[in-house]
Curated annotation (Swiss-Prot):
<keyword id="KW-0131">Cell cycle</keyword>
<dbReference type="GO" id="GO:0007098">
    <property type="term" value="P:centrosome cycle"/>
</dbReference>
<feature type="binding site">
    <location>
        <begin position="125"/>
        <end position="128"/>
    </location>
    <ligand>
        <name>GTP</name>
    </ligand>
</feature>
<dbReference type="GO" id="GO:0036064">
    <property type="term" value="C:ciliary basal body"/>
</dbReference>
<feature type="modified residue" description="Phosphoserine">
    <location>
        <position position="45"/>
    </location>
</feature>
<dbReference type="GO" id="GO:0005813">
    <property type="term" value="C:centrosome"/>
</dbReference>
<keyword id="KW-0496">Mitochondrion</keyword>
<keyword id="KW-0342">GTP-binding</keyword>
<feature type="binding site">
    <location>
        <begin position="23"/>
        <end position="30"/>
    </location>
    <ligand>
        <name>GTP</name>
    </ligand>
</feature>
<dbReference type="GO" id="GO:0010811">
    <property type="term" value="P:positive regulation of cell-substrate adhesion"/>
</dbReference>
<keyword id="KW-0898">Cataract</keyword>
<dbReference type="GO" id="GO:0016328">
    <property type="term" value="C:lateral plasma membrane"/>
</dbReference>
<keyword id="KW-0206">Cytoskeleton</keyword>
<dbReference type="GO" id="GO:0005654">
    <property type="term" value="C:nucleoplasm"/>
</dbReference>
<dbReference type="GO" id="GO:0003924">
    <property type="term" value="F:GTPase activity"/>
</dbReference>
<keyword id="KW-0449">Lipoprotein</keyword>
<comment type="subunit">
    <text>Found in a complex with ARL2, ARL2BP and SLC25A6. Found in a complex with at least ARL2, PPP2CB, PPP2R1A, PPP2R2A, PPP2R5E and TBCD. Found in a complex with ARL2, ARL2BP and SLC25A4. The GTP-bound form interacts with PDE6D. Interacts with ELMOD2. The GTP-bound form interacts with ARL2BP. Interacts, preferentially in its GDP-bound state, with TBCD. Interacts with UNC119.</text>
</comment>
Length: 184
């Protein structure tokens, strides 16, 4: 994020943030977004392209971009990087088969220049499912402790029950606002 972007955001009376939600297909990105927004989650289908939701939370205006995670769509992810304040990486904790794919895709995002400085929240989703990897196990598999380029946090959650979605989002907002916004 450039200096002009930071200065512009400091002057804004309305605290507006751009959050980019990415992850492999079927990780639960759209379900998290809908649950957070209080919408029905019974009829969710794979995202072919992207969804944008604008939500108000804790005095912030959040523009959340939920981008499809199918392999055929991942090359388009870079089209959404510009002006991103926070990156939400969603992991299907029950999908042990694709953890290496998940790790590889996350690592490729972290070297993107246009995401430099963006705060990273990793949602270890589907904690309600039997056999789901714990947050600590995912932390190891994804090699999160090696991340030095971004502030990050991993939060175990369930998009279906809504458990731990708010603490994750609140951490993200606290971290972003401590970097971007000045005290009033």
């Amino acid at each position: 994020m450039g200096l002009l972007t930071i200065l512009k955001k400091m002057k804004q009376k309305e605290r507006e943030l751009r959050l980019l939600m990415l992850g492999l297909d079927n990780a639960g990105k759209t379900t998290i977004l809908k649950k957070f927004n209080g919408e029905d989650i019974d009829t969710i289908s794979p995202t072919l392209g992207f969804n944008i939701k604008t939500l108000e939370h804790r005095g912030f205006k959040l523009n959340i971009w939920d981008v499809g995670g199918q392999k055929s769509l991942r090359s388009y992810w870079r089209n959404y990087f510009e002006s991103t304040d926070g990156l939400i990486w969603v992991v299907d904790s029950a999908d042990r088969q694709r953890m290496q794919d998940c790790q590889r895709e996350l690592q490729s995002l972290l070297v993107e220049e246009r995401l430099a400085g963006a705060t990273l929240l990793i949602f270890a989703n589907k904690q309600d499912l039997p056999g789901a990897l714990s947050s600590n196990a995912i932390r190891e598999v994804l090699e999160l402790d090696s991340i030095r380029s971004h502030h990050w946090c991993i939060q175990g959650c369930s998009a279906v029950t809504g458990e731990n979605l708010l603490p994750g989002i609140d951490w993200l907002l606290d971290d972003i606002s401590s970097r971007i916004f000045t005290a009033d």
